[in-house]
């Protein structure tokens, strides 16, 4: 019964993500842990805004084997890696939003640091806007096992929290339930949009923009 509720919650999250436009043209992939040895993940080539329960495939997390023989998402290995690394993770959401894709290319370092935003508290455990939230950025790679190795190497030195970006590709985020994963996704997307807008304003800060209306409060309307 719990599994059915979680899958129902994941389907609802996928439809919501589709409405947001965060997984266009069948992009992205979503998964749900069943137990320590198995997860469900979206089948390759499925539109995330119209997924049904039968579009999720059973996968063995130890080796990415799919008993049904159907084709799971090409990035299944990143989902199963996260489930192996962190037993508390129950759901993983991978999206291709404009904000995540562009910001991951604009940021030249290997991490995006978010600080000063009240909405950082949408992420579990965050208590203050003064703290720094570090979202690692990994260079994109069509060799998913190689990319997974780089993610695992990072995690050996510093625990992954909330999510990571793949440059020019998108966001992976997760939670200890579908509800938490969805909240983390929404919070991070808001923060990404804020950070992207802030950087755009910084670039244009030397431009003298004058209002095209009279804003003098002492002038009476005629």
Curated annotation (Swiss-Prot):
The keyword Zinc applies. Pathway: Amino-acid biosynthesis; L-methionine biosynthesis via salvage pathway; L-methionine from S-methyl-5-thio-alpha-D-ribose 1-phosphate: step 2/6. Its cofactor is Zn(2+). Keywords: Amino-acid biosynthesis, Lyase, Metal-binding, Methionine biosynthesis, Zinc. One of its GO terms (biological process) is monosaccharide metabolic process. One of its GO terms (molecular function) is methylthioribulose 1-phosphate dehydratase activity. The keyword Repeat does not apply. Zn(2+) binds at residues 94, 96. It catalyses: 5-(methylsulfanyl)-D-ribulose 1-phosphate = 5-methylsulfanyl-2,3-dioxopentyl phosphate + H2O. One of its GO terms (cellular component) is cytoplasm. Binds 1 zinc ion per subunit. It is an enzyme of class 4 (lyase). Pfam families: Aldolase_II. Its EC number is 4.2.1.109. Belongs to the aldolase class II family. MtnB subfamily. Catalyzes the dehydration of methylthioribulose-1-phosphate (MTRu-1-P) into 2,3-diketo-5-methylthiopentyl-1-phosphate (DK-MTP-1-P). This is Methylthioribulose-1-phosphate dehydratase. The gene is mtnB.
